[in-house]
């Protein structure tokens, strides 16, 4: 259902070009990131089911690891053929607002030569690749937002996923750091 919803949004030009940075530093940079997104907002039964599952994961992470996670934000991501996302971190060091990143893959029957893998790098040696995640439907990846460098390799076929972040409330100069 989530895959169908994302493809429907893409077919009706209802996705936004993804950018980098936040607030006044937000930029569209196709040379860095080529996907299009739509934020999840519980508007469908499938989104509600997914977000409820993430709320359960949040409770489990908080109970087991005392992370103080208070919110989860997520968006559909559609990578057209040829798109990629250069190596990056999901949270600026020292900000600690995004704590755990998640990626749930939606594309069924992903071929071995489809490209679009997420490459995870060693945080202590960023040139050393430690894992490749094939973007096959049903695969779910979770990693530390502030310390794990990763990238999406160029895809040869359209690639779909849900990217999300468990957040901790960070105070920036006495002002709460809002989601998105």
Feature locations, PLM:
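Fe(II)/2-oxoglutarate oxygenase catalytic core
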Residues: 1-101, 105-140, 146-180
